[in-house]
């Protein structure tokens, strides 16, 4: 099963291409970033990044997941927005 927190870490790592920068952005340590990505790769049964001398680069599977994860993120934000607005109108 895919964990939303793992996807959030994946999105940050895809954006920054650095575990340190992704961790700083999410306010978690670099080791946690690595563990979350490893858990996601294990859940999916596939590596998501190629490790190069220039850092981390999304591979083909990672690029597919990135598109889908962005859609999930947008949907979650929309759910939060619509339920928050509804809660405020019912108070």
Predicted features and spans:
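The DNA-contacting recognition helix of HTH DNA-binding domains
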Residues: 4, 30-31
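Helix-turn-helix DNA-binding elements, focusing on the entry/boundary residues of the two helices
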Residues: 18-19, 37, 51
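A short LG(V/I)-centered, amphipathic sequence patch enriched
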Residues: 41-58
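Short helix-boundary/capping micro-motifs
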Residues: 12-27
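Residues within the DNA-recognition helix of helix-turn-helix
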Residues: 29, 36-39
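Interdomain hinge and pocket-entrance segments immediately C-terminal to HTH DNA-binding domains
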Residues: 84-91
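Alpha-helical residues within the helix-turn-helix
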Residues: 24-25, 42, 63
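Short alpha-helical "packing" element that flanks the helix-turn-helix/winged-helix DNA-binding module
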Residues: 6-13, 65
């Amino acid at each position: 099963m895919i964990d939303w927190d793992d996807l959030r870490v994946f999105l940050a790592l895809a954006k920054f291409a650095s575990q340190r920068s992704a961790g700083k952005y999410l306010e978690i340590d670099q080791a946690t970033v690595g563990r979350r990505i490893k858990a996601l790769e294990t859940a999916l049964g596939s590596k998501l990044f190629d490790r190069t001398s220039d850092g981390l680069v999304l591979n083909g599977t990672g690029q597919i997941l990135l598109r889908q994860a962005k859609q999930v993120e947008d949907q979650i934000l929309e759910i939060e927005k619509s339920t928050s607005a509804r809660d405020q109108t019912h108070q």
